[in-house]
C-alpha cells in the first residue's frame, strides 16, 4: 500500500519535506474546542465524537474518566471501543482503527490473542482467585516469579513482588526502599530523585515521582521527599555546540550537585525510565546512564529502573536495561507483562535488598506490605503465557526486523515546517511540534497543534497519544510490514492536513 504522502516523499527525495504542505483532500474536521481549550497532556482531543442523536451515544456518562477534562465527558460522546483484533480496534459503530499506541503502550501482542484468552479461562475454571498473604500462594504466581527472574539478565535479581499496575509498583518501591534503609539504621536516607518530564504513575507517591506538572497541579504534589533533576532531552536542553556526551556529563554533574546540596545521607534512590515515555518519548543521550550510575554508586544511592513501558521488547531488547547497560537495584514492570490482558505489575528486587528485607521482617514478625490481588492467579497465568509467546515467536527479533522501517518511515517527515524533532527507537516514537523548528518557539497553546494532529489521525482510522504539542506512537509488537506502512501513510496524511490548518491559523493571526 502506497499512500500519497509516501509517493510525494519519494518523488521529491532531494527536496525538503517542508515543501510538502498541501493536503491530499479537503479537511473540514477540526476540534470543536481547539480555539477554546489549552493544549492538554495525556488525552487526545475527542473532536470526532461530536454531538449525536444516536441512541448509542454516551455523552454525560456516569464514569469519572481518568486523564479526561470534565467538559469532554459532559459535552461529547466518548470514543467507545467495542472489540479488538490484532493491531486493530473497532468502535461501537464498527469503525476500524489501527491502534498505534497499543492501548496505553501495553497490548504488545495485539488484540484477541487466543492463547492468552485460553490461559485466562483455564485458570478461571481451575482457581479464579487466591491470595499470597501469610505464606499461602498459588502455583501461577510462583511460576511467573521464577520466569521473570530467569528472563532478566542485566544483572542477577533475587525476588519478585507482585502488584496490579506500574503505578502500584513504583509506589511500592518507595516503601521497600524506606524499609530497607530503616533496617540498615539509616532513618534519614529517605529522599527520592526523579527527573523532569518523567512519568511513574498516578498514585500519590508515583505521581510525586513523575515530573509532569499536570500530575501535581491542585493535588498538593509532589510529596516533600521527592526531588527532581534535569530531563535528559538533548534536542531541547543542550547548550550551543554541546555534544551529547558533554550534555550527559553536565546532567551527571548537576545530579551530583543536587545530592551534595541535600546531603548524600538523605538520598535513598534515583528512579528513571530507560526511555522516557509519557514525557514525549525521550531516549537518553550518549553515555548518560554510564555517568549517572557512577554518581549513584559514589554516594550509595539505589537505582530504580522503571521498565513499565520498555520491558519485553519495545526497544528491540527484552528489557531497556539491556539496551543501555543499566545495572539496577530495583525494577518496575507492568503493561506488556500480560500484554494488558489482565492487570498485573511487578518489582524485581536485588538479592542484597531482599536479604535485608528478610532480616528486618524476621525481627518484626512480618513484611507488612501487599495487596489483595498481588500475584492474582489469573493475571499470573496470562502473564506466563505472554512470556512464552515472546520467546516462542521470537518477538524481539521481529521487532528488530520491522523497527528500522517504522523509524525511517516516520522520521522521513522530520523536514515538516511544524515538526521540531521526531525521536525514538525500536517500536516507540515521539514527535514534537514547534514553530520555526526551534525548541524555543512553541505554537500558541490555544491552537492545540498536537490535538489537531491527533484528530486528523483518528479521522483516518489511527489512534495515537497526544500530550500537549507532543504525540507518541507505540504500536503492538506483532505489527506486520503492511501495518507499518499503514501507520506511516496515515501519519503523513494527518501531518499534511495539520500543516494546512496551521498555515490557516498563521494567516488569520497576520
Curated annotation (Swiss-Prot):
One of its GO terms (cellular component) is mitochondrion. The keyword Transferase applies. It holds the Pfam family Aminotran_3. It is found in: Mitochondrion. PROSITE patterns: AA_TRANSFER_CLASS_3. GO terms for molecular function: 4-aminobutyrate:pyruvate transaminase activity; adenosylmethionine-8-amino-7-oxononanoate transaminase activity; pyridoxal phosphate binding. Keywords: Aminotransferase, Mitochondrion, Pyridoxal phosphate, Transferase, Transit peptide. Its EC number is 2.6.1.96. The modification N6-(pyridoxal phosphate)lysine is found at residue 335. One of its GO terms (biological process) is biotin biosynthetic process. It comes from the Eukaryota. It catalyses: 4-aminobutanoate + pyruvate = succinate semialdehyde + L-alanine; 4-aminobutanoate + glyoxylate = succinate semialdehyde + glycine. Pyridoxal 5'-phosphate binds at residues 166-167, 306. Substrate binds at residues 199, 335. Residues 1-41 form a transit peptide. The keyword ATP-binding does not apply. Transaminase that degrades gamma-amino butyric acid (GABA). Belongs to the class-III pyridoxal-phosphate-dependent aminotransferase family. This is Probable gamma-aminobutyrate transaminase 3, mitochondrial.
